[in-house]
A protein has these predicted regions:
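Conserved helix-turn-beta segment of the N-terminal RecA-like "Helicase ATP-binding" lobe
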Residues: 127-150, 240-243
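Conserved Helicase C-terminal RecA-like lobe
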Residues: 93-96, 101-122, 293-317, 321-431, ...
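Conserved helix/coil segment N-terminal to the catalytic DExD/H
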Residues: 152-186
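SF2 helicase motor core recognition
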Residues: 174-179, 228-230, 389-393, 415-419, ...
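Conserved P-loop NTPase motor "coupling/switch" region that bridges the ATPase
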Residues: 115-117, 132, 161-162, 188, ...
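Conserved helicase motor
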Residues: 125, 146-154, 170-175, 196-202, ...
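A conserved SF2-helicase RecA2
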Residues: 457-466, 470-517
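Conserved pre-motif I regulatory segment
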Residues: 56-91
Length: 517
């Protein structure tokens, strides 16, 4: 029971064990006792450690939850859980608002003086769109910087400045680990998409482990813990709950896996329970459990163009600027020109003779793989161009991710077979589709994630594509839509699609803006 938002009151038969808490009072009530304890974060943690169940964090009543958005109940519960655990996991599904929960919890600890600086480790693709975006929408009063630069010296300078929140990518930590340790004020490390640290022999794992002290807060977040193999839990547990796993990886492997042949291992019957015990303390919300989430949650992944893409993109943009000088650009001309820019952005462009020119687009494909790793369910990937569909499919096949293609060259009977397998069988896991082939009425509810590997040129088509998964028969209740973008033209088009702006005059206006950027 919470009394006046100041004290916790509960019954006990053994009041003596609470004597270690300075701010407490024991009262005899009948044959038993009631204990009143000051409701502070430290006191709440001690009560939890003493075995008192369901001790609430003071953040639930003593925090103003700053920012544009009112927190949803599952976000409050997640933030409260984080404040009560120095090291913990958040395994909630993608699109449930883990980022905001972690930022609010961090801000609360900073207000209490328990955390001075925060280091956030995440993929490049979500440093700006997810983390910096949510900082601006919530804890805007905190100073923040993205410590990402081609030169290590510049990254080090960013660390040495007094920004309260520093965001960097996994590999970037290796360049600044010494400075982070020397600073001594990074009391909290937040790791997003934590599966990147599943292997404890990698450089990135060792870099992270090197900056942690027994007093460091560490919150690791992923929607799919140990999704590929029970052995994947080892690296994560060694960071958060080292007592929960053996000292050496081979002992963990022998505990959770059976050796079938010289090179083949299979999970033991008890592996799931062992992984669950190792990956604690943890909190998880599925999208279906988050009743206050909208039915469709949209997320953005940003990826830099490769030098090759940037070179040809800028060259083509310059040519367009010359061609447009003094001429009236029609919507048809604008659409054709922007199509070329979109093709380069996605990694495969057509020449005037319909020959395909492939560009280095490895970072974009890696971002797609990140998205797939963050959900355990099936995924639909939409790409405008056949050349890009081929590139995606080839990449997924090399990564041993079962996939099928649907586009204009696939017959109606074969499409029906592919859709039936996608809906009713374990494989394919990914369907790579051309939007034009996504006819009205097609149901693809086996997927709960829709990825746009670049923007479309029509709001109607975009809405139809989202509706393939967001329709009757969807068991997830919530669908996640992911935009992958890199170039200015993509960002402008995705913004127009999100705002449902579908006007031919927009194309000419956007064309003029793009070529003049």
């Amino acid at each position: 029971q919470i009394v006046d938002n100041k004290a916790l009151l509960f019954k006990t038969r053994n009041p003596a064990k609470y004597s270690i808490i300075p701010k407490h009072k024991v009262m005899q009530v009948g044959d038993g006792y009631e204990v009143a304890v000051y409701w502070g974060l430290d006191e709440a943690r001690v009560l939890r450690n003493l075995g008192v169940k369901d001790v609430p964090s003071p953040i639930t009543k003593r925090y103003d939850w700053p920012g544009r958005y009112k927190p949803m109940q599952h976000q409050i519960d997640t933030a409260a859980f984080l404040t009560m655990h120095r090291r913990s996991f958040v395994f909630s599904e993608p699109g449930t608002g883990k980022t905001l929960s972690a930022l609010w919890a961090a801000d609360y600890l900073m207000k209490l003086g328990k955390v001075r600086r925060v280091l956030i480790l995440c993929p490049l693709s979500i440093m700006h769109s997810a983390w910096m975006g949510d900082i601006n929408n919530s804890v805007l009063h905190r100073s923040a910087i993205i410590a990402h630069h081609p030169k290590a010296a510049r990254r080090i300078e960013m660390i040495q400045q007094d920004y309260e929140i520093v965001i960097t990518n996994y590999e970037g930590l290796g360049l600044i680990a010494d400075e982070v340790k020397a600073d001594g004020r990074f009391d909290l490390v937040i790791v997003d998409e934590a599966n990147a640290y599943k292997t404890n022999t990698t450089r990135r794992w060792k870099a992270l482990n090197s900056i942690l002290t027994p007093q460091t807060y560490l919150w690791m977040m992923t929607g799919t813990p140990a999704s590929q193999s029970p052995t994947d839990a080892y690296g994560l547990a060694k960071l958060v709950n080292p007592e929960g796993v053996p000292k050496f990886f081979t002992a963990w492997r022998d505990k959770v896996m059976n050796k079938i042949t010289m090179y083949k291992w299979a999970p033991k019957v008890t592996a799931k329970d062992d992984v669950f015990s190792a990956l604690q303390p943890a909190i998880r919300f599925t999208k279906a459990e988050c009743l206050d989430l909208p039915p469709v949650v949209t997320m953005t992944r940003e990826v830099e163009m490769t030098p090759q893409q940037a070179k040809y993109y800028n060259t083509l943009k310059t040519q367009m600027l010359v061609q447009a000088a003094g001429e009236t650009i029609t919507a048809v001309n604008a659409a054709a020109a922007m199509n070329k820019l979109l093709q380069i952005s996605c990694g495969a462009a057509y020449t005037d003779d319909r020959e395909v020119v492939e560009f280095d687009s490895a970072p974009r494909l890696s971002v797609l793989e990140e998205v797939l790793e963050e959900t355990s369910r099936k995924v639909i990937v939409f790409a405008l161009y056949l050349s890009v569909i081929e590139t995606i499919s080839t990449y997924l096949t090399k990564k041993r991710i079962a996939n099928e293609q649907i586009h204009g060259g696939v017959t109606a009977s074969k499409r029906a077979q592919i859709i039936h397998r996608f809906q009713n069988e374990p494989e394919p896991r990914v369907l790579v589709m051309q939007p034009q082939a996504s006819a009205h009425g097609i149901t693809l509810t086996a997927a709960d994630t829709v990825v746009f590997y670049g923007p479309l040129m029509s709001v109607e088509q975009y809405t139809q594509c989202c509706a393939r998964a967001d329709r009757k028969g969807q068991t997830s209740d919530k669908v996640t839509v992911v935009h992958i973008q890199s170039s200015p033209v993509e960002k402008r088009l995705f913004k127009a699609l999100s705002q449902k702006v579908d006007d031919h005059s927009l194309l000419t206006e956007m064309f003029n803006n793009v070529i003049s950027e």
